[in-house]
Amino acid sequence: MPELPEVETSRRGIEPYLVGQTILYAVVRNARLRWPVSDEILTLSDQPVLSVQRRAKYLLLELPKGWIIIHLGMSGSLRVLSEETAAEKHDHVDLVVSNGKILRYTDPRRFGAWLWAKDLETSNVLAHLGPEPLSDEFTAQYLFDKSRNKRTLIKPWLMDNKVVVGVGNIYASESLFAAGILPDRAAGSLTDAESVLLVATIKAVLLHSIEQGGTTLRDFLQSDGKPGYFAQELQVYGRAGEPCRQCGHPIEIAKHGQRSTFFCRHCQH
């Protein structure tokens, strides 16, 4: 599933081709995504794009009359293509833009979403979200205070969007490894010092992944069709049984909340 770095990579990739341009109309080949494509998108015409933003794992296209909210789901990606580029099997939505380009949404598993909101404050999918991990709101003190008396395992707790947004399965495993913290500890066991280190590593891992264009494990592509290169730098995720790059001990795998967690028991405590 695309996580924060992949969504931010998509945002940065599509922004130069959309802002200041006009969406002439939308082509929806299959409206049956996780939720049906909103009617307002089906009938969209001649709408200038004011900004391209991101909140958590949602892309937000600001138009004069409201917002298009895009979620990439499990396997979605956005590409900027020439208008004459023929659609393929899993190309479900196009936005046709005044500069001769199209923004094409591809999603083999159709678990993404294209929604409409009159304003972001009334959007159900954006309600109750925690702070952005790269913002000044996400501090060691915030994380420490939030973790008090929490018996939930720290790794699934970090993936809770009410705690902090956008830290999905890949980056929770990678950040905990970088901080030297075992993922099966209770969140409430975090110390002050560990909170400082964990917040710093989450920010560093996410920023480095964004610089590398995100992580491509299966379906994700950048807006120019290239894969994300952070997959080549993964320390633990997807490496069960392989030697740890720091100590040589085998990377272990466990199931936490039906998600695979990767860690090194020798380097993490």
From Swiss-Prot:
Catalytic residue positions: 2-3, 57, 259
Zn finger (FPG-type) start-end: 235-269
Pfam family, one: zf-FPG_IleRS
CDD domains: EcFpg-like_N
Record keywords, A-Z: DNA damage, DNA repair, DNA-binding, Glycosidase, Hydrolase, Lyase, Metal-binding, Multifunctional enzyme, Zinc, Zinc-finger
InterPro entries: DNA_glyclase/AP_lyase_DNA-bd (IPR015886), DNA_glyclase_Znf_dom_DNA_BS (IPR015887), Formamido-pyr_DNA_Glyclase (IPR020629), FPG_cat (IPR012319), MutM-like_N-ter (IPR035937), Ribosomal_uS13-like_H2TH (IPR010979), Znf_DNA_glyclase/AP_lyase (IPR000214), Znf_FPG/IleRS (IPR010663)
Cofactor: Zn(2+)
Enzyme Commission number, as recorded: 3.2.2.23, 4.2.99.18
GO BP terms, alphabetized: base-excision repair
Keyword DNA-binding (UniProt): yes
Keyword DNA-binding: yes
Cofactor note: Binds 1 zinc ion per subunit.
Family the entry assigns: Belongs to the FPG family.
Function: Involved in base excision repair of DNA damaged by oxidation or by mutagenic agents. Acts as a DNA glycosylase that recognizes and removes damaged bases. Has a preference for oxidized purines, such as 7,8-dihydro-8-oxoguanine (8-oxoG). Has AP (apurinic/apyrimidinic) lyase activity and introduces nicks in the DNA strand. Cleaves the DNA backbone by beta-delta elimination to generate a single-strand break at the site of the removed base with both 3'- and 5'-phosphates.
Protein name: Formamidopyrimidine-DNA glycosylase
Organism the protein comes from: Yersinia pestis
Gene: mutM
